Amino acid sequence: MSDISKASLPKAIFLMGPTASGKTALAIELRKILPVELISVDSALIYKGMDIGTAKPNVEELLAAPHRLLDIRDPSQAYSAADFRRDALAEMADITAAGRIPLLVGGTMLYFKALLEGLSPLPSADPEVRARIEQQAAEQGWESLHRQLQEVDPVAAARIHPNDPQRLSRALEVFFISGKTLTELTQTSGDALPYQVHQFAIAPASRELLHQRIEQRFHQMLASGFEAEVRALFARGDLHTDLPSIRCVGYRQMWSYLEGEISYDEMVYRGVCATRQLAKRQITWLRGWEGVHWLDSEKPEQARDEVLQVVGAIAG
């Protein structure tokens, strides 16, 4: 698409970044100044009843800056990148029709990628193939299957943990059904996003600062009642660790504690470590992202001003 064609497209803003980087605070600040409406891009914030452990914006924040695509699924339900793209495009069209600008904020990089580039069609699940994979896992262990994935699709294997059976199984299933790797298929773009997008990433300049913020926030969540929140989910009886909701960072570790698998101190340690690993993966995604403008979260006023400088012309 030519620059002239792009300039004629409606405008949108992406505000991306690792967990605990200050994305929400900046987005709320920007809404006070720019004619924007916020759309959440977060695979955990979609779930109802999962507020503390996901650092969901609180009532006051949502009154100041309503977020779309929050609380749209029960924790028992699945939600795919394709679901997100469909829903986000509908919300973006609604915002644009009202004469405002969509500001998409979050840290689920796969959702941003799906929205920006489109999705290639993946083969539907095959119960027979899935059963064969699960049988092999029962006999040889998921570590063995992870090594198998590493041989055929090292890129996906680097992204998928051996202790993530659902994603590991799906990656192998796609290969067995189609003969093509998940990486090959997901790199085949579908329909590109019909918007002129200004992309920003916010993070502390120092990784150590981000690690400190992650640890502080995890302890703040615990002090705010995170354990009680997960106990309520645990008590439902219909939720389990094969669900994407319960595999969310923090929830998986608290679940293990409630099941008596680990001590409280071990839960805290694992929760902090898992959150740091998530942040590392998010930053790795962003380092390879094209056309992104980096912001320093330790200088919030400067970050705000940089966004305004880049996108200020579109606010008129």
UniProtKB/Swiss-Prot annotation:
InterPro entries according to UniProt: Dimethylallyltransferase, IPT, P-loop_NTPase
Example GO molecular function: ATP binding
Top-level enzyme category: transferase
Residues noted as binding ATP in the record, renumbered to the chain: 17-24
EC identifiers of the protein: 2.5.1.75
Binding annotation for substrate: 19-24
The protein's assembly and partners: Monomer.
Function: Catalyzes the transfer of a dimethylallyl group onto the adenine at position 37 in tRNAs that read codons beginning with uridine, leading to the formation of N6-(dimethylallyl)adenosine (i(6)A).
Family (UniProt): Belongs to the IPP transferase family.
Protein name as catalogued: tRNA dimethylallyltransferase
